[in-house]
Curated annotation (Swiss-Prot):
The gene is rplU. GO terms for biological process: translation. One of its GO terms (cellular component) is ribonucleoprotein complex. Transmembrane segments: none annotated. It comes from Burkholderia multivorans (strain ATCC 17616 / 249). One of its GO terms (molecular function) is rRNA binding. Pfam families: Ribosomal_L21p. InterPro entries: bL21-like, bL21-like_sf, Ribosomal_bL21, Ribosomal_bL21_CS. This is Large ribosomal subunit protein bL21. HAMAP family: Ribosomal_bL21. PROSITE patterns: RIBOSOMAL_L21 (PS01169). Belongs to the bacterial ribosomal protein bL21 family. Part of the 50S ribosomal subunit. Contacts protein L20. Keywords: Ribonucleoprotein, Ribosomal protein, RNA-binding, rRNA-binding. It comes from the Bacteria.
Length: 103
């Protein structure tokens, strides 16, 4: 069984037992959270799509860890003008383990 969930402005296809990194969620480590924005649920050949959400469906997950992604380097330069600007960004994430899918 799998589900398509929406969190942090992104959509993820998840199954029970998977781990995934999503945008940071303010929750403690080892806390159980419920993701109720389920867009689709499927098992085998049968798929149930929501309009836009599947009513009564939810995904239970456990927070495994919090962290930061690898650094993205930003470099701006104007040719022939001796202008260079360096910058960087590291996005925070929350790692989740999917425990159950309720459809």
């Amino acid at each position: 069984m799998y589900a398509v969930i929406k969190t942090g402005g992104k959509q993820y296809k998840v199954a029970v037992g998977e781990k995934l990194k999503v945008e940071q969620i303010p929750a403690d480590i080892d806390a159980e959270i419920t993701l109720d924005q389920v867009l689709a649920v499927g098992e085998g050949e049968s798929i149930k799509f929501g309009t836009p959400l599947v009513s009564g469906a939810s995904v239970k997950a456990t927070v495994v860890s919090h962290g930061r992604h690898a650094k993205v380097t930003i470099f701006k330069m104007r040719r022939r003008k001796h202008y260079q600007k360096h910058g960087g960004h590291r996005q925070n994430y929350t790692e989740l383990r999917i425990d159950a899918i309720n459809a």
